[in-house]
Amino acid sequence: MVANMFELGEQPYSEADAEWDAFVAAHPRGSLLQTTNWARLKSRFGWSTQRVWMRRDGRLVGGAQILFRSVALGIVKLGYVPHGPLVDWDDAEQVDVLFNHIDQAAYSRGAGMVKIEPRIWRQEMGPEEWEALYRRHGCVPSPDTIQPPRTIVLDLRPAEDEILGRMKQKTRYNIRLAEKKGVTVRQGTAADLPAFNRLMLITGQRDNFGVHDSNYYRAAYELFAPQNAALWLAEYEGRPLAGVMVFASGHSAAYLYGASSDEERQRMPAYAAQWAAIRWAKARGCATYDMWGVPDAEEPELEAAFTDNQHGLWPVYRFKRGFGGEVVRTVGAADRVYNKLLHRIYTRRRGQH
């Protein structure tokens, strides 16, 4: 039998949180989005958080950090487990016990559903097998994901020269061109966050995507930096032209936020900033670097269509592909449904966006 502990409610940073973060960092499928500081960040912007976990012989063996908020015009209370739960999916008893804990947490919050998005790549198990596994444990497979299901992951274990060698020739050229054209890169501080926010606003308007409020980027930086996040700015003659905010958890780094100016684009500042972030992640000991989101299409379609498509994540695919990583996709999302009517309302509302 699995020895279980189940905790409801929120708590200040404590020994239990440190233990949880160590578990997430060491877990092969652990993610930044399951860390205590990610819960702290989201709790400042409309979410409430709750964690459930299991122990065997006094040791954490599984758990989930759940985010809750009202969605669909406030009609539906949603529970969301980003990049989780963290559990041994081959251990049916452990999975069932953990889902029972998740269900209890959801009931206590009045949630009509909980969406899970484990960070497990399709290379590990095909979609049909995975859907059958979801259903076996009472989950409804869902095409609706909150995090981008497809991404590009770089292997940071080789030497820097080999990492460069795996990039597209044009990307290597642009990294070197930035230096030749006088672009300098430095690690930013909290004082640089207003400049980074301005770049984010410019990028959002140019590329037609939503950006967070400036307070969000400040909170993210203050919670994670300097140990688990860094801000890199590419400048020309003292003017910030591009920025990258990179995060790390355990042996994985993630490129969550990036921005660039409309000025001096021929100097390739975005390439310089990205390379600095990759080098930081490698120096920190990360084995992988997640470029965090590309269009959800198979690689042959990505390669055939990226030059013509200019909507959604297509414009950034051209940039991200150049850094030479592997295109991977998660097994997708699934929903724990407690109220079928509310689940239909949520699904219909999501389909309108």
Residue ranges and their predicted role:
Residues 2-5, 13-17, 27, 67-68, ...:
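Active-site/acyl-donor-binding loops of N-acyltransferases
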